[in-house]
Amino acid sequence: DWPSSTNPEGQRAGVHALFCLVCEGCEEIFNALSDKEEANFAHLCAEQLKKHVYPHNGLKQALALQVLAGLVDANEAFDELLGKDGVHGFSTFLGYYILKALGQADRVDFALDCVREYWGAMLDLGATTFWEDFDINWAKNCSKLDEILPEDSQKTDIHGDFGGYCYEGYRHSLCHGWASGPAPFLMEYVLGVKPLEEGCKKVLISPSLGNLEYAKGTVPTPYGLIKISLKRETDGSVKTEFSAPAKIEVVLG
């Protein structure tokens, strides 16, 4: 993404990891289509790509993608970089993949803290939709979106004074879907719903409440909504209730 473009070495590592994920995704699609020849080719491509791991050069986005591609152990990545300095180094688009990598390391509580700190800072500044870009350092001594600054103000304008690349200043979009990573992360790792077969004919429900007291949500499927409710009991255990359409096979994790 744009914010990672200043780190070419890390960017190379991230693109390589993405290519691995693409080949694995293609293998899965071709298997679903019963095209064994193309599935085998995609599998071989992924195997060849995974024989080399590029250095991430301190880029959290690249290391997160390497975790998701199976190139790097999730817990080692957390200890080395992903668990350090809070949300410094996050970006709106690839922040989702950092959250996923944290989920794979069983650090849902830390990931939720990151959501509060990074996306929560946008809310504190008046956001009503997801922003195209955001750096946590912008939040220091800046105005809210609906605040009119006097000419002699010592504050910065959160909209007009930041942004970059092709979206400097007021060209910076304050309604950008690519920054909505917390939404799927909450479905996948807190509610814990993940498809196991194409078309959601079979799904895994393996919730993790993290440091939340409760969570409730729905996940859409071709057969209707899966509904899940999680609540922490006084003894620390988590009560899980769910319902799923009859045509969906549910596996509890």
Where are these regions (language model features)?
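The feature captures the catalytic groove of carbohydrate-active enzymes
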Residues: D1-E47, P55-K100
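Sec-exported extracytoplasmic/periplasmic mature domains
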Residues: E28-N31, Y54, G103-Q104, R116-G120, ...
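Secondary-structure transition/capping motifs at alpha-helix termini
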Residues: L33-K36, V72-E76, A105-F110, A121, ...
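Non-catalytic C-terminal accessory modules of carbohydrate-active enzymes
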Residues: L44, D113-G253
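Secretory-pathway/luminal and periplasmic proteins that interact with or process carbohydrate-rich
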Residues: K51-N57, A121-L125
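Generic structural signal for hydrophobic core residues of well-folded globular domains
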Residues: A69-V72, L102-A105, F134, V190
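Repeat-solenoid scaffold signature
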Residues: G86-L125
